From Swiss-Prot:
Gene3D superfamilies named in the record: 1.10.150.870, 3.30.1900.20, 6.10.140.1510, Metal-dependent hydrolases (3.20.20.140), Nucleic acid-binding proteins (2.40.50.140), PolC, middle finger domain (1.10.150.700), Ribonuclease H-like superfamily/Ribonuclease H (3.30.420.10)
Gene this chain is encoded by: polC
Keywords for the protein's UniProt record, in alphabetical order: Cytoplasm, DNA replication, DNA-directed DNA polymerase, Exonuclease, Hydrolase, Nuclease, Nucleotidyltransferase, Transferase
Documented EC number(s): 2.7.7.7
UniProt name for this protein: DNA polymerase III PolC-type
NCBIfam families registered for this protein in UniProt: dnaq, polC_Gram_pos, PRK00448.1
Presence of the UniProt keyword Protein biosynthesis in the record: no
Cell compartments where the protein resides: Cytoplasm
Chain's role: Required for replicative DNA synthesis. This DNA polymerase also exhibits 3' to 5' exonuclease activity.
GO CC annotation terms, alphabetical: cytoplasm
Reaction(s) this enzyme catalyzes, per UniProt: DNA(n) + a 2'-deoxyribonucleoside 5'-triphosphate = DNA(n+1) + diphosphate
PANTHER family: DNA POLYMERASE III POLC-TYPE, DNA POLYMERASE III SUBUNIT ALPHA
Gene Ontology biological-process annotations: DNA-templated DNA replication
Entry keyword Cell inner membrane: no
Length: 1444
């Protein structure tokens, strides 16, 4: 009997037009629909069907396709098949295999490819899948089998487990194949390399030729109709079958899949939201289209919206993708009637503006603007970039700053009279007002107390009816209601009464300038005389008397002076409290000999008054080159002398440096606009006299004033702007309309919003509901903004006046066009003499020709190009360090210079490998590449006198240092001991004077991860939910903005004594830290690198460690041999240490040896087994280069093409190898320069190399290289490493004491003191975390590896000893087998506390834990640690009093 479920199934077959399919009836006999799961949100219907047996694959596939097709307009369809009597066969397993792999949900294309290349089979009822080897098996087990098994079951197969076995036959074939490959001759391999390179070259050319030329806009798929409805991205919230969007591409990636296809991934925004758009390639033309699409274009996309399992986000899978033309804003004003922006902020305005000056200048050029100003907040750091952008775009740059102007000190007393303060009668008054503007707001309460001798003798208190309802803000602030003022006396009547009340008195108020402004405005309004009585403002008086206070509000002062203050913000109570506060202050003023009213202002400006004034903004533009230098000086003083929260410019400093500058009145925070808004036309006119031009801005930029009720409404705002124009005309000063630009386009406002949000309460803009619209406006947009002024006035302020101002300003250059080096008298002769003296001392009175020629060539370059002083400075620094007992290591290519060697700057000798006799000066040079390093020459006695010969020379060309012509500015980097670095830095002040040396300044900008954090915080705090692509977009918009400043860790810039620093840059303190020891350049040092000499005086651990090793052992490190066989044995095994590789978990003994201790380099050592200094040089070069070892030299060695001595290791190898092979030296140099910078080798140069029989493998290796290490740098590092390794081999405890004291920061003291098992357990714990281990844990693991090695060598660690331990150094104990831990090894115990413990112990032994805590400044948690680990067993808890 047919069931209802069977009937439903037959209905389904009819619905999908399947019931008459011939030959398929049998397999669906008794088939049922068990249930249908409907997923509403994802629009997926899952049919659960029950059938007898597994369907034949072709039936299943056709049925599945027909089902999906039938429901395509309703939902996506999935099926789950339940079988009653399933029978598995090899046929069925194989037929379904590809479908199962594809639909298993396996994300990894590599795993999919692995799976597709195999087919499972049945063996004794087990399903078997073969793998070539254990690695492939592991991949399949971990990542593929589970999804594959589930997918089989879903389509009707019974549950089974796939068993993965290694295909022994296949594995053996692979092994035999490898052996066969190994057995091939070098000639065959070389020929293969030739063919590969040739094929690669042909393929490149072929691909260039075959790739279709993309002309015009990119189109992938079909053309999308212009009439197609566009969906805004913000409205896409769930999966959709078809949607069309358009937007701006802001990021692009093309991934190559293992299948050979390519995947295009775009991040696109329409500025309502952002989406990832994906498209797979189908043809080579598609791939060419992928390459043609770039970030920065607009596209229209039609596709489906789906949840991407990998991204865990909705993405758009594109069917059709069309590049479209997007009309950006244009400036359509006539050519000679374009505006110029005179107020603009770049991303160097700290955390406040988003675009680079380069972007603005480019846009100005696009719009046809002839000039643009850069006026960042208090900084000039965009000047160098602006200069370059201006030159590139042919746009004139106006160099300026928006400065924070402060008065040098405001008066305390006004209308001064010689009146005795103690005998005077005072009126202390306060007002309550409807707002902050004396011009537009009204007094609603006026109250005062009259006082004599500190006593109240009369009071005055009146409400005033303002004639309109009070705002809620006013009511909340003043506690005055409409009922209280309604029907009160008029303003005129109250003001007349108050004027009478004040006769013959001194008037006093707190922040009285505010109240006096309101009073005088009211008096003026009613034709009464303004205040003539002497008056005092207690706010600046308090700042003078109590500079230590941080705030000077009335309630703060009342608390300090013990004055009771009730009902604050009610006028009568505030007035009375101010009176008592004033009398208390008067006593303190008398102690400073302030006895009369006219004594107060003698003290104006004292006690850092500039800190207490509220800064007002002003635009300062450099008019001339002299003005630019004055701007540098003025900015420097604001940063170095007058920095307080922001860099401040006292008015007197601006006057001092005003020559060549133009000063404008700036924005709403400028004093002229503020005065017009709050104090009225007359006061504004007085303020405006100071400025060269006035400034107004579009109304949207003043919206915060409306929000804060500082301006009542739009009419008030237009009146203020109109009055600003009127004022400028009256004073005959130009007035200009500016944009106060902070970002490029309106839609970019969100980036600034995110930056400001990140600063929380520190930025007052966060109190605004909406930030002002401060985008870069076109001429048309600006004219429209000021249309309310009338067409003529709008054009005057938008176009005419700004252009006139531009024409008044000279062409200015903020950066120099050449290098200015310091001069040291006699430097040339000193360098010559130092060089020749050592050369003769080493090589004899008559120098060998090779030495003489090299020195002649170098001295001509060094002296002839004015580089002597650079060499001499370095020589003096190194000489002083050596004299003080610290070796100096050289970095970079300075070791390529024989003059540097002869003057003692570097130990590296760049001559070819050679012998020299220290006694009779006999020499012998190997000039044909027979040896890679002189240190590898066999030991030999002098054939003339029998003295043991010195072996030297690294065969490094001079050209790698100063270029082929010898005119490249030398960059001498020196590695001083980290302990000695500050001394070396300060020695430059001795050499050149404090005002001629500065630390190289740096600019810290918002990094990608930081920006991402800002966006996530903004998303959280504003309760929004951004897609991943939108987060990426917003983070990109916030990236690159100046966040702080700093200093280069080593760079010292030297100003020549015939110039001053302001010829190059302003100066400041790093991160505005006024306590810093050094001042830095204001400009990032990279921008002036080619103009001023930079010394790189680095701090490094190796010289510090060498010094400690020398101190502990008494051995001079310079006497250590460079070819000691025991030391060399470290690099190929562990026997020399007396341990096995298993014990120390390393196949070499180089743990803790600089340059050779990392896992990566140890792996290289295991593969290469270096035995010579030259090979160690190669290893150093290979490990620091990019694409020099991995995929290059490593493969050449593995396949037997070359051996270790032949590979390219350092950049200099290329030049010297090619010269030895017969390539001309200049061509060899050019090839080396191209290769080391990753530029490849041009075809014609390759032809020259082949003509000189350069092997093809060598050319191929060069073509892969992206970056190479200088050989001189490698030589200096390896030399230092060998010296340290020597102590590790022969003076182990000395080595370990130095290592743990100098190089280690993180310790597991408990494990180390308990022995090797505990250390091994700690290592295993960290290793088990894999990539989840923290950076601190990874650093600790390195330390534990060294600790384990030391323990395995038979030495021990001892826990801290309260009576013996050093503050920071590990010390060797009397038994010669134990290292005692210092106090800093205790977790959480810093160096300062460690030193305090030792200092206190030296004064007197600790008698208790309480004593240790008090005198040693040791916290309870540290006491607990020491107690738990038996450090304090001999100390009682508390001090005890003894009677005996």
């Amino acid at each position: 009997m047919e069931t209802n479920k069977q009937d439903l199934f037959k209905k389904l077959l009819r619905q999908i037009n399947w019931e008459n399919k011939h030959g398929f009836e049998e397999v669906f006999t008794n088939a049922e629909i068990q249930k249908v799961e409907v997923h509403v949100e994802s629009k997926v219907w899952n049919f659960h069907l029950q059938i007898e047996d597994i369907l034949p694959y072709e039936v299943f596939y056709q049925f599945y396709q027909q089902l999906q097709l039938a429901f395509k307009d309703i939902a996506k369809v999935d099926i789950t098949l339940h079988t009653k009597n399933p029978i598995i066969t090899n046929q069925k397993l194989g037929d379904y295999w590809k479908w199962v792999v594809f639909n298993s949900g396996i994300q990894s294309s590599f795993i999919q490819e692995l799976s597709r290349s195999k087919v499972p089979y049945l063996d004794n009822n087990r399903v078997i899948l073969l793998a070539e080897n254990e690695i492939v098996k592991r991949f399949l087990v971990d990542q593929a089998l589970g999804p594959l098994e589930s997918t089989y079951h879903k389509i009707g197969f019974p549950k089974f487990s796939v068993n993965t076995l290694v295909d022994e036959t296949k594995a053996q074939e692979i092994i035999e194949n490898i052996k066969e490959q190994k057995a091939k001759s070098d000639a065959e391999l070389a020929q293969k390399a030739v063919e590969a390179i040739k094929k690669q070259s042909e393929q490149r050319e072929k691909s260039k030729a075959e790739v279709p030329s993309i002309e015009g806009p990119v189109q992938l798929g079909k053309k999308i109709s212009p009439d197609q409805e566009i969906t805004q991205m913000i409205n896409i919230t769930e999966e959709e079958r078809s949607v069309t969007v358009q937007g701006y591409v802001f990021d692009k990636e093309v991934r190559e899949l293992r299948s050979g296809r390519k995947l295009l991934i775009l991040e696109v925004t329409d500025y309502t939201a952002s989406f990832v758009v994906k498209k797979f390639s189908r043809t080579e033309e598609d791939e060419a289209m992928f390459d043609a699409i770039n970030s920065g274009v607009w596209i229209k996309v039609r596709g489906s919206v789906q949840e991407d399992n990998y991204m865990r986000d909705l993405v758009i899978n594109a069917y059709d993708l069309n590049e479209i033309k997007h009309e950006s804003r244009k400036d359509t004003a006539p050519e000679n009637e374009k505006r110029v922006e005179l107020h603009l902020h770049s991303n160097m305005s700290m955390m406040d503006a988003t675009n680079s000056i380069t972007e603005y200048v480019s846009k100005a050029a696009e719009w046809g603007h002839k000039a643009i100003a850069i006026t960042d907040h208090g900084t000039l750091q965009a000047f160098p970039e602006a200069h370059a952008a201006g030159q590139k775009n042919n746009v004139k740059i106006l160099y300026g700053v928006e400065a924070n102007i402060v008065d040098d000190g405001v008066p305390i007393a006004y209308n001064e009279q010689h009146k005795n303060l103690r005998d005077a009668t005072y009126v202390i008054f306060d007002t309550e007002t409807t707002g902050l503007s004396a011009q537009y707001d009204k007094v609603i309460e006026l109250a005062a107390v009259k006082m004599e001798k500190g006593n109240v003798i009369d009071t005055f208190e009146e409400f005033i009816d303002p004639g309109h309802p009070l705002s809620q803000t006013t009511i909340n602030l003043t506690s005055i209601t409409d009922d209280m003022v309604r029907g009160s006396k008029s303003e005129e009547e109250v003001f007349r009464l108050f004027k009478e009340f004040c006769k013959d008195c001194i008037i006093v108020g707190h922040n009285a300038t505010f109240d006096v402004d309101f009073m005088n405005t009211g008096y003026e309004r009613h034709n009464m005389e303004m205040i003539q009585e002497p008056w005092i403002d207690t706010l600046p008086l308090a700042r003078y008397l109590y500079p230590e206070m941080k705030g000077f509000r009335l309630n703060t002062l009342a608390k300090k002076l013990n004055i009771k203050l009730e009902h604050h913000h009610r006028a009568i109570y505030d007035a009375e409290a101010t009176g008592f506060i004033y009398y208390a202050m008067l006593k303190d003023a008398e102690e400073k000999q302030i006895l009369y009213h006219d004594d107060f202002n003698k003290h104006v400006g004292e006690n850092d008054a500039y800190k207490h004034e509220h800064p007002s903004h002003a635009i300062i533009l450099a008019k001339t080159q002299e003005g630019l230098k004055n701007l540098f000086k003025l900015t420097s003083e604001s940063m170095v002398k007058y920095f307080y929260r922001v860099p401040r410019v006292p008015r007197s400093i601006l006057e001092k440096y005003r020559e060549g500058l133009i000063v404008g009145s700036a924005c709403a925070d400028g004093e002229v606009f503020t005065a017009m808004m709050q104090k009225g036309y007359t006061i504004a006119k007085q303020k405006a006299e100071f400025y060269d031009y006035l400034e107004v801005q579009p109304k949207p930029l003043y919206e915060p004033l409306l929000e804060q009720e500082l301006v009542k409404d739009n009419d008030n705002l237009e009146e203020i702007i109109t009055n600003m124009v009127k004022l400028a005309h009256e004073l005959d000063k130009p007035i200009v309309a500016t944009g106060d630009v902070h970002f490029m386009n309106k839609e970019d406002a969100i980036y600034r919003k995110i930056l400001i949000h990140s600063q929380a309460g520190a930025n007052p803009l966060n109190r605004l509901k909406k930030l002002p619209d401060a985008h870069f406006r076109t001429t048309d947009e600006m004219l429209e903004e000021f249309s309310f002024l009338g067409e003529d006035i709008a054009k005057e302020i938008v176009v005419t006046n700004p252009n006139k101002l531009v024409d008044e300003i000279s062409e200015i250059t903020p950066v120099k066009d050449k290098l200015y080096t310091p001069k040291m008298e006699g430097a040339e002769q000193d360098i010559h003499d130092l060089t020749m003296n050592r050369a003769h001392a080493w090589y004899g009175d008559t120098l060998p020709e090779i030495v003489q020629k090299r020195l002649d060539k170098e001295l001509k370059s060094v002296i002839g190009n004015g580089f002597s002083v650079i060499y001499l400075i370095s020589q003096k620094l190194v000489y002083k360090s050596n004299k003080d007992g610290y070796l100096v290591g050289s970095r970079g290519s300075v070791g390529s210079s024989l003059v540097a060697t002869m003057t003692g700057i570097t130990e590296v000798n760049p001559l070819p490998p050679h012998y020299r006799c220290p006694k009779c000066k006999w020499t012998h040079f190997y000039e044909k590449g027979e040896y890679g390093s002189g240190y590898d020459l066999p030991d030999k006695d002098c054939p003339n006198c029998g003295t043991e010969l010195i072996k030297d020379g690294q065969d490094i060309p001079f050209e790698t240092f100063l270029g082929f012509k010898g005119n490249k500015v030398p960059d001498i980097d020196l590695n001083f001991s980290g302990d000695y670095q500050p001394i070396a830095h300060n020695y430059t002040k001795v050499l050149f004077g404090e005002n001629n040396v500065y630390r190289a300044g740096t600019i810290g900008t918002v990094a990608d991860k930081t920006a991402y954090g800002y966006v996530k915080a903004y998303e959280r705090d504003t309760e929004q939910n951004f897609r991943g692509a939108e987060i990426d977009r917003l983070a990109k918009g916030a990236t690159g903005v100046k966040r702080t400043t700093g200093q280069h860790p080593a760079g010292i810039l030297v100003v020549p004594d015939y110039m001053d620093i302001y010829d190059f840059t302003p100066i400041q303190y790093p991160a505005d830290d006024l306590t810093a020891a050094w001042r830095t350049t204001h400009f990032d040092f990279h921008s002036i690198h080619d103009n001023i000499l930079k010394l790189d005086i680095l701090g490094h651990d190796d010289p510090t460690m060498i010094r400690m090793l020398q101190d502990l052992s008494g051995i001079d490190p310079k006497t250590i041999p460079t070819d000691d066989p025991g030391v060399m044995a470290l690099f190929s095994g562990t026997d020399i240490l007396g341990v096995t590789p298993e014990e120390i978990q390393s196949s070499t003994g180089t743990l803790g040896v600089p340059e050779f201790g990392t896992r990566f380099v140890r792996g290289m050592l295991e593969e290469t087994h270096p035995k010579t200094f030259a090979e160690l040089l190669k290893i150093s070069g290979l490990s620091h280069g990019t694409d020099v070892w991995l995929g290059n030299a490593e493969e050449l060695i593995k396949n037997g093409t070359v051996t270790m001595p032949d590979v390219i290791g350092c950049r200099d190898d290329i030049m010297m190898d090619l010269i030895h092979m017969g390539v001309e030296s200049d061509k060899a140099f050019k090839i080396m320069e191209h290769v080391r910078k990753g530029r490849g080798i041009p075809d014609e140069w390759q032809a020259d190399m082949r003509a000189a029989d350069v092997p093809e493998w060598y050319i191929g290796a060069c073509l892969k290289i992206k970056y190479m290490f200088p050989k001189a740098h490698a030589a200096a590092y390896v030399l230092m490493a060998l010296r340290i390794a020597y102590f590790k081999v022969y003076y182990p405890l000395v080595y370990y004491a130095a290592y743990f004291s100098v190089r280690a920061d993180d310790f597991d003291l408990v494990s180390m003191s308990r022995g090797k098992e505990a250390v091994k357990n700690a290592m295993e714990l960290i290793n088990s975390k894999g990539n989840e281990a923290t950076t601190k844990e990874k650093n600790l693991l390195t330390v534990l590896e060294i600790a384990n090695e030391m323990l395995e060598r038979g030495f021990d660690f001892s826990m801290v000893d309260i009576n013996k331990s050093d503050a920071q150094n590990w010390t060797i104990q009397e038994d010669g087998r134990t290292l005692l831990a210092p106090f800093t090894a205790i977790p959480g115990l810093g160096l300062n506390v460690a030193k305090q413990i030792v200092a206190a112990r030296e004064e007197q032994e600790f008698i208790s834990k309480e004593d240790l805590s008090k005198r040693g400044k040791v916290s309870q948690s540290l006491i607990d640690f020491m107690t738990e680990n038996h450090v304090l067993d001999d100390l009682p808890d508390e001090n005890q009093l003894s009677l005996f």
